[in-house]
Amino acid sequence: MAKRFFEAYNETPDGTQCHRKAYITTALGGLCGLISSAYSITHNPADSPLEAVARVGRFTFTAAAIGAMFGLTTCVSAQVREKPDDPLNYFIGGCAGGLTLGARTHSYGTAAIGCVYMGTAAALFKMGKLEGWELFATPKV
């Protein structure tokens, strides 16, 4: 399923169709949040069903917001800078996602660390895409 999201994201060039890319990154972020909330509830059971639902919502919507900020910021940065295939656009988008996480947790430290780590991971992802690295390798039989 994640592979399908990445393929849909890569169908259009960077800096175009920002609404579509934001939708895809929001969905991918929400999926990651849903998976992480399932692990959280499995390994640390909630005291009540209401607490479990609240935890799922908190994880899912936070991750979806991070994905939305990444998608919008990356696309707008590519349009403003007029350099659609630059890894710096992805660093800026990842940094915006990290700042969103910091705002959600009310922590400057989380925002700073999230900016650096998410920005670096996103820039490396873009560099790998430009150089032909395989994120989902096909098995060689």
Curated annotation (Swiss-Prot):
GO CC, one annotated term: mitochondrion
Its job: Accessory subunit of the mitochondrial membrane respiratory chain NADH dehydrogenase (Complex I), that is believed not to be involved in catalysis. Complex I functions in the transfer of electrons from NADH to the respiratory chain. The immediate electron acceptor for the enzyme is believed to be ubiquinone.
Gene name as annotated: Ndufa11
Transmembrane parts of this sequence: 21-43, 58-80
Modification type N-acetylalanine: residues: 2
Compartments it resides in: Mitochondrion inner membrane
This protein's UniProt keywords: Acetylation, Electron transport, Membrane, Mitochondrion, Mitochondrion inner membrane, Respiratory chain, Transmembrane, Transmembrane helix, Transport
Pfam family, one: Tim17
A single GO BP: mitochondrial electron transport, NADH to ubiquinone
Protein origin, superkingdom: Eukaryota
Annotated membrane topology: Multi-pass membrane protein
Record-given protein name: NADH dehydrogenase [ubiquinone] 1 alpha subcomplex subunit 11
Subunit note: Complex I is composed of 45 different subunits.
Similarity field: Belongs to the complex I NDUFA11 subunit family.
Keyword presence, Transmembrane: yes
InterPro entries referenced in this protein's UniProt entry, alphabetically: NDUFA11
Organism from which the protein derives: Rattus norvegicus (Rat)
